[in-house]
């Protein structure tokens, strides 16, 4: 006769709390950029995996998980309980940072959105315009517009890495407010940001950018426009990042 082990529910829950969340490469790169010992806010938290991981690792002392939709936020609440961080993680229904205050976060992560939406969220939270606040941004699209908008608004990128998640290539930006607005960025800075040549996944990111710029160049040529600036940027990016070596 087969024997069955009976496992108490409280034992299972204890085992769950001891589990560590494993983040995908994109979110792990965001986690890597968060400073140690901070209060963190994750905007567009989805299932709450990032703030849970930051609390588990000890990088974050407290966390606010914010989302505009109730369903993913309910999932974040359940996951916080499941992994034993409910006492340090608050889940908030919020459009961007509208329901948060400066006391909620030292580091603010906005990941998994388009660059223009990220800019809107930042522009609507005046309290981010303080040098002690740190932004970790991961645009899914229009990273060039995000960089331009950040510099035009007095923010500066102090670090940027490319990250490949197995399917797509992204960038993650570390950003602080300086108050010094810049409205004209070189094309290489606009499209490659602060990604260092030779850094992991930089050549793959450059290949993606070059594909986009070459399409722009073809469109300009077809319309009879001046392609000189684009040509120079394409040549500079190709020489610096050597995407053909990827």
Task: Give a label for each model feature.
Residues 105-112:
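Short SAM/SAH-binding signature in class I
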Residues 37-46:
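Conserved class I S-adenosyl-L-methionine
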């Amino acid at each position: 006769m087969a024997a069955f082990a009976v496992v108490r529910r409280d034992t299972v829950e204890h085992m769950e709390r001891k589990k560590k969340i494993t983040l995908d490469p994109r979110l792990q790169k965001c986690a890597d950029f968060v400073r140690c010992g901070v209060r963190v806010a994750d905007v567009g938290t989805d299932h709450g995996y990032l703030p849970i991981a930051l609390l588990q690792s000890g990088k974050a002392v407290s966390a606010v998980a914010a989302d505009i939709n109730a369903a993913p936020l309910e999932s974040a609440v359940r996951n916080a309980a499941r992994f034993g961080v409910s006492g340090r993680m608050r889940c908030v229904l919020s459009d961007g940072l509208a329901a948060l205050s400066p006391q909620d976060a030292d580091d603010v992560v906005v990941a998994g959105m388009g660059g223009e939406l990220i800019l809107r969220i930042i522009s609507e939270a005046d309290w981010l315009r303080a040098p002690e606040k740190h932004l970790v941004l991961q645009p899914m699209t229009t990273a060039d517009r995000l960089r331009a908008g950040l510099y035009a608004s007095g923010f500066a990128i102090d670090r940027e890495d490319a990250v490949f998640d197995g399917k797509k290539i992204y960038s993650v930006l570390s950003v602080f407010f300086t108050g010094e607005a810049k409205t004209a960025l070189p094309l290489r800075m606009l499209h490659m940001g602060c990604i260092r040549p030779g850094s992991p996944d930089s050549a793959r990111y450059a290949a993606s950018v070059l594909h986009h710029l070459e399409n722009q160049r073809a469109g300009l040529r077809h319309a009879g426009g001046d392609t000189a600036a684009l040509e120079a940027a394409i040549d500079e990016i190709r020489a610096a990042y050597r995407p053909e070596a990827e």
